[in-house]
């Protein structure tokens, strides 16, 4: 995507990122801070989140706070408590990037282990839904809120062996579409499909692939910025590809 955002694109915006400790989420958190946002980091690993907050500060960004939430074990009550804690420090949320995700096993359907299947659904769908429910009141306080989910190519077209992960991403697309209709005119809701990107998850999914052939998280940030800022103000109910035209599957 060719997009040259204004340096102050996200000034006065408060943006929460899940899975902010690593990979694409870490890069998104750093990038949002560079464009002026006050960033709230959510994840399950305190040391990694603290390191991201420190980097934001070292780069001259606004001080960011981090909060621990393990999507694998979270309950609706834990999500409500998190929203409550956030509301003590912040008046509203202008953006939420649901980025945290779990891959599970890349094996045929008849070999998908039910406990791994349930973990993938819990992190990618159920936990993400519970957190969304808890954060909606804060998002609705913004006059230009943007709620962004993270999908995948296998969330739009099923592919052999992608099992629970693919099914969870179809569910993510559905959740986005339902919410986009329900909050039409109040909150925009979209998905990003990052496309193959050089992260730990990608290396686990394609261990034989040469990572150098992949875009880095930094390369795909233009779309992440565009969807959080006012340049995409009227867009809702859509899945956007961060790498349009890229053929899904292993990079040759
Ligand atoms: P990584 O594995 O590099 O990072 C995943 C992030 O999610 C980490 O911050 C991780 O935390 C966090 N996370 C995982 N499980 C939990 C949990 N139970 N509770 C809270 N946080 C959790 O993945 P990517 O950066 O590659 O992926 C980011 C998103 O993009 C995912 O939704 C993925 O499905 C999607 N995606 C990625 C593609 C790619 O090629 N990379 C392609 C298509 C979609 P921790 O640091 O503690 O492990």
For each feature predicted by the language model, list its residue ranges.
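Conserved glycine-rich Rossmann-like NAD(P)H-binding loop of the short-chain dehydrogenase/reductase
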Residues: 37-52
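Substrate-binding pocket helix/loop in short-chain dehydrogenase/reductase
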Residues: 82, 107-109, 113-119
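Residue(s) in the substrate-gating loop at a strand-loop-helix junction
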Residues: 152
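Conserved glycine-rich cofactor-binding loop
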Residues: 14, 21-23
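Active-site helix of classical SDR
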Residues: 132, 168
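C-terminal helical subdomain
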Residues: 185, 191-194, 199, 208-250
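Rossmann-fold cofactor-recognition segment
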Residues: 59-74
């Amino acid at each position: 995507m060719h997009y040259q955002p204004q340096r102050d694109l996200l000034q006065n915006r408060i943006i929460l990122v899940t899975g902010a400790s690593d990979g694409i989420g870490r890069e998104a958190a750093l990038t949002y801070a560079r464009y002026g946002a006050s960033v709230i980091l959510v994840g399950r690993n305190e040391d990694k989140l603290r390191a991201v907050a420190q980097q934001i500060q070292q780069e001259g960004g606004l001080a960011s706070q981090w909060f621990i939430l393990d999507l694998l074990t979270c309950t609706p009550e834990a999500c409500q408590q998190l929203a409550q804690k956030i509301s003590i420090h912040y008046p509203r949320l202008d953006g939420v990037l649901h980025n945290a995700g779990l891959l599970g096993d890349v094996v045929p359907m008849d070999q998908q282990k039910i406990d791994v299947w349930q973990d993938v659904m819990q992190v990618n769908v159920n936990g993400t839904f519970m957190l969304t429910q808890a954060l909606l009141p804060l998002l609705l306080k913004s006059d230009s809120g943007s709620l962004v989910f993270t999908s995948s190519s296998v969330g739009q077209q099923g592919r052999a062996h992608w099992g629970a992960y693919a099914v969870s991403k179809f569910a993510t697309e559905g959740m986005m579409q339902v919410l986009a209709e329900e909050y039409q005119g109040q909150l925009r809701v979209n998905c990003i499909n990052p496309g193959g990107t050089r992260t730990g998850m990608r290396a686990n999914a394609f261990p034989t692939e040469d990572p150098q052939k992949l875009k880095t998280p930094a390369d795909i940030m233009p779309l992440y910025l565009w969807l959080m800022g006012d340049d995409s103000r009227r867009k809702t109910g859509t899945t956007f590809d961060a790498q349009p035209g890229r053929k899904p599957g292993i990079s040759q």
